[in-house]
Amino acid sequence: MSMNRRNDIDIAKGFALFLVVLGHVVTMHHTIFRWIYAFHMPAFFFLSGMTFRPEKYPSCLDYIKKRGRTLILPYFAITLTALAVCTIRPYYHQAISEYGWKHILKWIFYYGQPQQIYTGQLWFLPALFFAGLYALVWLRIFDRKHIVTRCYALTALMLAGTCIRFADPLIPVMERHPWKLDSALCAAVFLIAGYYTNRTKLLEKMMPYTGFLIPFFVVLSFFFGPKLSEYVNLCDCRYTAPPYYFGAAFSGIFALLLTAKLASLPAISN
């Protein structure tokens, strides 16, 4: 398979990054805010799935070693650097003094989502690490099964991901699962879907119909998102009913990807 960079994927990442910024600028719980949160983080996991190569990892241990170097080590390097800066600088140290070291260290080393040191966005790295691990195991088990079996297995993963917070009372010491293991379940759904979308060249097959599909997916994502649902957040495992959540997420993702693919065409990009 060609190792050349995909311009459409790079453009889609740019669009998704813009939505991240816009999502943090728009007033919380505004309609646009809820619409962006319906699909912008799922889009990043979907895009990661489009470049996912399970054949690179002969075993789960190989995956842990390789992806640990590229995802978990950067998480600690950036987080501990930020923690050092916030400890030294008096202005930034105020939040640490207010919340206490126990709170700060718990969120860094247990939850995998630094708080009060301005690097909370790094939750994506451990979530991507475990989403990839889940996806690798899922593909090892189901990739060669009949498509109906795969659909049932992916549906089961969807339900597990959206219902995982019901297991929180069973955790003896903390309020949630560690290291974004819960967020990674839903993230794995998008990663697997991205993998199959790329492998089957689904986007390429949709391209002749972009004039209809892009506005259709935009309207559909808005309908299943802010129209029918409340605020959702993959990071916090805050979901609505699975048909609404995944309907809004996948519709928004395909609208974004088809727009990016259209923008990557030579006649437009040049």
PLM features: residue spans?
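Alpha-helical transmembrane segments and their immediate juxtamembrane cytosolic regions
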Residues: 1-270
